[in-house]
Amino acid sequence: MNSSDERKLRELGEAINYNAYGDSVADLAVDPVDMYRAIQPYSDPLDFIASTSVLPELQTRRTEDLELALGLVEVRRLANATLHILPDAAWARRVRGDFANLVARRDPARAHAVLTAGADGRYTGSVRAPLDCPRGADVLCRKFGGNGRVAAAGIEGLDRARLDEFAAAFSIAFCGESWGAGGR
């Protein structure tokens, strides 16, 4: 396979994966049933890419969502971490994990949490441990009803009344002393 085809397939996989993010089907750029119907007639994904506008449409949506997140106003810069709070909007729910990965790559020495506000007064969030020391995200998230992997984890249903408690725990979760005898 040539590198151009490999790139196209990677981009298609990333776009389809991105389309799965959100809290409900209404948040998605393309309904999964419609996505299936668009893909199903093609036995070769490269033919699908060449014959439809699905890939560029999803790439555009992802780019637009990231641009909206980058323009957000509410950011709390804590001692060892950065807390980003996104609004109650479909684009914010779609971009939450992707944006967490982006800010983690841009500032690998810090931990990052991206929370989206919900209409019910609760937050859903993606937490990334510092890329320079990728551990502890799972431990933090379990304290707030979430779970995940050591470097990347999430929470659901964080009550607004607990936001400051989460911010305080998040601020200290990734400092050197929190690692115990093993250190960083």
Report each predicted region and the residues it spans:
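Glycine-rich, acidic loop segments that terminate in or are immediately followed by a histidine
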Residues: 82-184
